[in-house]
């Protein structure tokens, strides 16, 4: 039993020695490392590793999380508090959008400012020269993929900019 334990210790020390020789090759200079030297160099390496990673792996304690949450909550609630007429949430984008409708087919600059990172759902516009029947601003079920009406969801924009609709198409926005 003692032989097996010593064999395991010696095997582990030999593995540590070979690892340390690669890392501390300039300090070892081909001398035979004793067991105490191997252990000292191992401790030195682990401490240097901990010191180098200390700034990178800051683990917040349980006390920091609630205080950070409480610190950010007033700013969020101030940003999202009801407007002057208590009609809903006060948001810069919502205030700019209040004057318009939920469908937008005209100004591409407004579309890119109001929804820089939200995908738009394209729907066919009213037929040219015909009477305008009331349409639901919502696409039919399955309209996000491909349906019999030909409504397609646009591919996600790589630069988070809203794309301009094709002529004769309107954009439905949920706000």
From Swiss-Prot:
The keyword Transmembrane does not apply. Residues 65-98 form the Orange domain. One of its GO terms (cellular component) is nucleus. It comes from Rattus norvegicus (Rat). One of its GO terms (molecular function) is protein dimerization activity. Residues 1-49 form the bHLH domain. This is Transcription factor HES-3. Expressed exclusively in Purkinje cells. Keywords: DNA-binding, Nucleus, Repressor, Transcription, Transcription regulation. Has a particular type of basic domain (presence of a helix-interrupting proline) that binds to the N-box (CACNAG), rather than the canonical E-box (CANNTG). The C-terminal WRPW motif is a transcriptional repression domain necessary for the interaction with Groucho/TLE family members, transcriptional corepressors recruited to specific target DNA by Hairy-related proteins. Transcription repression requires formation of a complex with a corepressor protein of the Groucho/TLE family. Transcriptional repressor of genes that require a bHLH protein for their transcription. Residues 124-175 are annotated as: Disordered. SMART domains: HLH. It comes from the Eukaryota. It is found in: Nucleus. Gene3D superfamilies: Helix-loop-helix DNA-binding domain. GO terms for biological process: hindbrain morphogenesis; in utero embryonic development; midbrain development; midbrain-hindbrain boundary morphogenesis; negative regulation of DNA-templated transcription; negative regulation of transcription by RNA polymerase II; neural tube development; oculomotor nerve development. Residues 124-145 have a biased composition (Low complexity). A motif (WRPW motif) lies at residues 172-175. InterPro entries: bHLH_dom, HES_HEY, HLH_DNA-bd_sf, Orange_dom. SUPFAM superfamilies: HLH, helix-loop-helix DNA-binding domain.
């Amino acid at each position: 039993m003692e032989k097996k334990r010593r064999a395991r210790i010696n095997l582990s020390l030999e593995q540590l020695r070979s690892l340390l020789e690669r890392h501390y090759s300039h300090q070892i200079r081909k001398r035979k490392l004793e067991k105490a030297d191997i252990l000292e160099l191992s401790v030195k390496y682990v401490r240097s590793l901990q010191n180098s990673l200390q700034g990178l792996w800051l683990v917040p304690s349980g006390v920091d999380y609630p205080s950070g949450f409480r610190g950010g909550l007033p700013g969020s609630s101030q940003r999202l508090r009801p407007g002057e007429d208590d009609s809903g949430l006060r948001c810069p984008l919502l205030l700019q959008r209040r004057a318009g409708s939920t469908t937008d087919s005209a100004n591409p600059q407004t579309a890119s400012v109001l929804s820089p990172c939200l995908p738009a759902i394209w729907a066919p516009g009213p037929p040219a020269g015909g009477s305008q029947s009331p349409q639901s601003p919502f696409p039919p079920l399955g309209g996000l993929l491909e349906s019999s009406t030909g409504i397609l969801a646009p591919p996600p924009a790589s630069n988070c900019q809203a794309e301009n609709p094709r002529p004769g198409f309107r954009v439905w926005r949920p706000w």
